[in-house]
Amino acid sequence: MLAAPLERPEFPASQNGFSKSDIVIHDDVLSKRDQDEVYDFLNAPGWAFGAYSDPAPNAPRYWYKHFAGYVRDGREAIDAAQFATNLGLAAPPVAKMWATLSSTILSGHKLTRCYANGYPSGCEGGLHQDSMIATHFTCIYYPHAEWHPNFAGETVFFTQDGSDILASIYPKPNRLIVFPGAIPHVARGISRTCPKLRITLMFKTMT
């Protein structure tokens, strides 16, 4: 008996069409010392399990650390003016990084959430959008000191109807990618040959 075909995901049309040029890559974002400090902090104990990017009941779950900002949909009773302060209390090395980014690459952006995801071997995400608001952005940082192509774990971006790939971004160490939250994207599975947790650090922002 043949398995039922998978349904192609369809997403609401955004306010503007997107292309690969909307996904901006910044390499060598931090000094080696600051990169190591961020990675060591993220790789320390304190992970919780159960995060997911696809709301389906059988969606893959993975590890996460929430540092500051909104946890769900932005309607929580949290003082947005305190996000950067809260980040400094919860994750000093990450707050130091945010201070650098907010005065350079992300000048004019306001922090709405900061968290980290951890994917072990065999784990993967689900195709999703972070927001449908044009002024909302997602920034993904890859903090590892090294990564091998055989480890996989690329971040893949799709067209709005999910029918084709816009871009596939390699998790190159010390790389930051910035993109509109409305672009559908997914963290691809981690190879069984990967001996470490694939860690990504996210800054959600608005302009």
Regions found by a protein language model. Name each.
Residues L2-S107:
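Non-heme Fe(II)/2-oxoglutarate
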Residues A95-T207:
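Catalytic core of non-heme Fe(II) oxygenases with the double-stranded beta-helix
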